[in-house]
Amino acid sequence: LAGSSAASDVYKRQFLGSLIVLAFQPFNYWLVTFLIPGLLYQLIKTEGIKNTFFISYFFGFGLWAFGIFWIENSITVYGGASPILGSFLTLLLAAFLSLFQAISFTAFKLVSSQRKTHEIFLLFPAAWVLSEWLREFLFTGFPWLYIGYTAVDNSLLQGYIPIPVSYTHLTLPTILLV
């Protein structure tokens, strides 16, 4: 990320991460789900470990900053905090949650460096599931923005897939389709 375009690169990664929010309710542009992970893969496939960490971190920051905007409202309206404090706390949470994407995709990069192409296409979805699993079970228990949720309300799968198993039964197949 060095050079004069470093700030521009950061914004591009954040923008890409924020676009995936469009796949969720209330927007429900679920086809975005098939485009954005593929673009993230294209961004990190030729990068080194350090750049992969930063690319996936800023991607995650865009995802979380736009995906959990409602928390700021909860903090200010129901918690009585100032809007500045509510915004700061929400961005702080987004910064923390972004670490899960960064760790998972950096692990993907470490594992995939000596793999064949068909193995990489299985490892990338596994890294996405790992980021959701780490967030859910090991650290925060924050069940928000599972990519598998985008498949629940689309016309193809509506009513067929239970929500409680979203990340295992929806996230992996969704990312595999990319």
Model-derived regions: residue spans:
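Membrane-embedded alpha-helical bundles of multi-pass enzymes
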Residues: S8-L172
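Positively charged, low-complexity/disordered segments
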Residues: L1-A7, T171-T174, V178
